[in-house]
A protein has these predicted regions:
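ABC family nucleotide-binding domain
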Residues: 1-215, 220
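Conserved beta-strand-loop-alpha-helix hinge in the C-terminal portion
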Residues: 219-231
Length: 231
């Protein structure tokens, strides 16, 4: 089991007496090599859940083990190490650094990892080729379309060779044709052995996953195969 979450809560306080339970007793597990879609409307708790699964945030209480490690007990430095080694992130807003070109954006997490220059070259080149952008390596984000920027973000996510890819609404800012291409890349990565966790509000996109988790008001309403998710 790669991810194991039990009785997870994330509570925000508004004033002295009011509280919002973004996550309210969530439990789930993800095996290595699964393709899981977490679906829900805005405010459902799906992005909060991804932030905790991705070690970008910590729960108010509850248990979370990632590859056997209790991440709720880790320091900020240790969480950053896990993010850099274990997880590749893809966001709806791309989150590329405007001053850097495509090559430099993809290379940056490898520099943080301390990967030698020769290895960095190999990995960046392979990642950009994987997403079909080797010919745009010297282009900055403002010189690329939204779809190209998202493919650079995918290249950045896979360059570190993480076992887990977490994608938060990766097609949300794209047209349908470009979004389909991005999904094809994610499915290709899954076929090569990556564990994919996809956050979406779109039933059609969620239906391409092996497994669907439907969340609303901080609760899991459905967790099972895609055939039963939309019955």
């Amino acid at each position: 089991m790669l991810i194991d979450v039990k009785n997870l809560f994330k509570i925000y306080h508004e004033g002295e007496e009011s509280e919002v339970r973004a996550l309210d007793g969530v439990s789930l597990s993800v095996d290595r090599g699964e393709f899981v879609a977490i679906i829900g409307q805005s405010g459902s708790g799906k992005s909060t859940l991804m932030n905790i699964l991705g070690c970008l945030d910590i729960p108010t209480y509850g248990d979370y083990h990632l590859d056997g490690v209790d991440v709720t007990e880790l320091s900020d430095r240790q969480l950053a190490h896990i993010r850099n080694k274990q997880i590749g992130f893809i966001f709806q807003g791309f989150n590329l650094i405007p001053a850097l070109n495509a090559w430099e954006n993809v290379e940056l997490p490898l520099i943080y990892q301390g990967v030698p220059a020769s290895k960095r070259w190999e990995r960046v080149e392979a990642a950009l080729e994987r997403v079909g952008l080797a010919g745009r390596a010297d282009h900055k984000p403002t010189e690329m379309s939204g779809g190209q920027q998202q493919r650079v973000a995918i290249a950045r996510a896979i360059a570190t060779q993480p076992p887990i890819i977490m994608a938060d609404e990766p097609t949300g800012a794209l047209d349908s044709r470009t979004g389909k291409h991005v999904l094809e890349i994610l499915h290709g990565l899954h076929e090569e052995g990556s564990t994919i966790i996809l956050i979406t509000h779109d039933n059609g996109i969620a239906a391409t996953a092996q497994r669907v988790i439907r969340i609303a008001d901080g609760h899991i309403l459905y967790d099972g195969d895609r055939e039963g998710a939309f019955a």
